[in-house]
């Protein structure tokens, strides 16, 4: 039976998905399941790692069943995942010692402050390309070892394993045979040296994490192992891994230096390919590994915006201003401007390029004339302003002026937002026909490893732009709006939460 399809497992922050692709990169089928978000304390976010696995397995089986595809028709599996989210489990029982600590979760903030006080910031920056922040896995692992009873002793005895979600899923899919991650995920842990491409002893000592917990680190496109035959009575090759944002960069075919994409999801993530050189940021961006493919490692600059789509979800769930997120577009178009209203959605602090953990959300410019339409439009516009903040930092670091921005993620269906994004950047914005670029990137990585696609050229040839948005705003209007945003951000950062 021929290998007809590639299968992507896309394990996201709010749902687990399985997507089937054909040779042209078209979607054959999708199955999705949401899972529980756990909020033990303000600012803390956790997931049940077993529920993540069960939901992922369920959608994997469902997408095959619903599309009448047999396991032996799958050429390979690619895995892409919410990055930084941390699982620690017992290697003998396979049971997690605690809930997974999610990337957004701030519970290791005190550990970060201690590390800064101890003077580790420069070392971390140089070796990992990251900042000391509760966002990254390393401080989450330390928090678990410090707070779960008996965990440190078990870890030191070699009984515990750490993994980001890709590692956890592969461990489960192979029934505990394979403990592995790829360069892109390893580069988000605070424990991996992105220049020497290995776990770094100095960083591990800083975090007091035993090396025996850590997975092997491999390129993003190679054979890692096979699914356990008890799962499907057929062993499917697992051949691609990338963190969700790097996978989207690959899925958008941003293979050349200076090409960039922005993903509009719960958060917003912009990545620019910088080729085989790790560009150190002077403007609050992260230097990260894009992927290891074809025997070489390529790097990216990344700007992480913590709250993007989550601001629209808040309008829906918190304020009950809209019934569904897509309603935001008609409200935004019901007014010509926000009438001077700016929303800075710093619900969990501000990410790139500000990195202010203490900032909280704010709305400025309210008058008696402000309506829900103005508020909703301001929330949408905040996504575009934050993207410009990041792009300006990226252009300054890389010395490259972006010619066009490739976009993907849930919010790109919003034509108002995409046009405003193009206007505020004064840059072409391209929306692809296949919006599932994260899953597509994982499929491409796996497909290259198993020979389903011959080369990156095949991938470039697959790409179809569904719609292009061109700037259509007078420059003085653009600069005036953006100046107002900068003022709002400065004011937001001036207001500190009281503990």
From Swiss-Prot:
Q: What class of enzyme is it?
A: transferase
This entry carries the following GO cellular component terms, namely:
cytosol
Which residues of the sequence carry a binding annotation for sn-glycerol 3-phosphate?
A: 13, 83-84, 135, 244
What PROSITE patterns is this protein classified in?
Answer: FGGY_KINASES_1 (PS00933), FGGY_KINASES_2 (PS00445)
Tell me which SUPFAM superfamilies the record gives: Actin-like ATPase domain
Q: In which pathway does it act?
A: Polyol metabolism; glycerol degradation via glycerol kinase pathway; sn-glycerol 3-phosphate from glycerol: step 1/1
- Where on this chain does ADP bind? 13, 17, 266, 309, 410, 414
Q: Which parts of the sequence bind glycerol?
A: 83-84, 135, 244-245
A Pfam family name for this chain?
FGGY_C
Which one of the record's GO molecular function terms can you name? glycerol kinase activity
Q: Which keywords, in A-to-Z order, does the entry hold?
A: ATP-binding, Glycerol metabolism, Kinase, Nucleotide-binding, Transferase
Q: Which reaction does it catalyse?
A: glycerol + ATP = sn-glycerol 3-phosphate + ADP + H(+)
Query: Is 4Fe-4S one of the keywords UniProt gives this record?
Result: no
Q: What is its EC number?
A: 2.7.1.30
Activity regulation annotation text? Activated by phosphorylation and inhibited by fructose 1,6-bisphosphate (FBP).
Gene Ontology terms: biological process: glycerol catabolic process; glycerol metabolic process; glycerol-3-phosphate metabolic process
The record's similarity note reads:
Belongs to the FGGY kinase family.
* Record's function text: Key enzyme in the regulation of glycerol uptake and metabolism. Catalyzes the phosphorylation of glycerol to yield sn-glycerol 3-phosphate.
Q: What is this protein called?
A: Glycerol kinase
- Write down the species: Brevibacillus brevis (strain 47 / JCM 6285 / NBRC 100599)
Taxonomic lineage is: Bacteria, Bacillati, Bacillota, Bacilli, Bacillales
Q: Which gene encodes it?
A: glpK
């Amino acid at each position: 039976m021929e290998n007809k399809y590639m299968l992507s497992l896309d394990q996201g922050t709010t749902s687990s998905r399985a997507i089937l692709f054909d040779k042209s990169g078209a979607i054959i089928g999708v199955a999705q399941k949401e899972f529980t978000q756990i909020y033990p304390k303000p600012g803390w976010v956790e997931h049940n790692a077993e529920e993540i696995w069960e939901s992922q397995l369920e959608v994997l089986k469902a997408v095959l069943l619903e599309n009448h595809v047999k396991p032996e028709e799958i050429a390979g599996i690619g895995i892409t995942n919410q990055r930084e989210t941390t699982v620690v489990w017992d290697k003998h029982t396979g049971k997690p010692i605690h809930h997974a600590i999610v990337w957004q979760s701030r519970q290791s903030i005190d550990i970060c402050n201690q590390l800064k006080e101890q003077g580790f910031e420069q070392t971390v920056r140089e070796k990992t390309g990251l900042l000391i922040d509760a966002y990254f896995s390393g401080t989450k692992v330390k928090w678990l070892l410090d707070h779960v009873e008996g965990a440190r002793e078990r870890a030191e005895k070699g009984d515990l394993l750490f993994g980001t979600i890709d590692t956890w899923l592969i461990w489960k899919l192979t029934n505990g045979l394979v403990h592995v991650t790829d360069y892109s995920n390893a580069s988000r842990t605070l424990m991996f040296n992105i220049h020497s491409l290995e776990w770094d002893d100095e960083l591990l000592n800083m975090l007091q994490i035993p090396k025996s917990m850590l997975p092997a680190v491999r390129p993003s496109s190679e054979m890692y192992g096979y699914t356990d035959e008890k799962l499907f009575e057929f062993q499917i090759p697992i051949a691609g891994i990338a963190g969700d944002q790097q996978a989207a960069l690959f899925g958008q075919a941003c293979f050349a230096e200076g090409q960039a994409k922005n993903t509009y999801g719960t958060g917003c993530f912009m990545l620019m390919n910088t080729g085989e050189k790790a560009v150190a940021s002077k403007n609050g961006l992260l230097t990260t590994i894009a992927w290891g493919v074809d025997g070489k490692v390529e790097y990216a600059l990344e700007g992480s915006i913590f709250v993007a789509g989550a601001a629209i979800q808040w309008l829906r769930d918190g304020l009950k201003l809209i019934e569904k997120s897509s309603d935001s577009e008609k409200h935004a178009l019901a007014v010509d401007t926000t009438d001077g209203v700016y929303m800075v959605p710093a619900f969990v602090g501000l990410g790139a390029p500000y990195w202010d953990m203490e900032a909280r959300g704010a709305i400025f410019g309210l008058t008696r004339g402000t309506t829900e339409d103005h508020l909703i439009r301001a929330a949408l516009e905040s996504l575009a302003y934050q993207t410009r903040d990041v792009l300006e930092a990226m252009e300054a670091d890389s010395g490259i002026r972006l010619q066009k921005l490739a976009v993907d993620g849930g919010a790109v269906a919003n034509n108002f937002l995409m046009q405003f994004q193009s206007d505020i950047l004064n840059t072409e914005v391209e929306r692809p026909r296949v919006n599932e670029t994260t899953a597509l990137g994982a499929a491409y990585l796996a497909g290259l490893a198993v020979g389903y696609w011959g080369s990156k050229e095949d991938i470039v040839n697959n790409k179809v732009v569904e719609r292009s948005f061109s700037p259509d705003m007078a420059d003085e209007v653009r600069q005036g709006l953006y100046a107002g945003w900068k003022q709002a951000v400065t004011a937001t950062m001036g207001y500190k939460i009281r503990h």
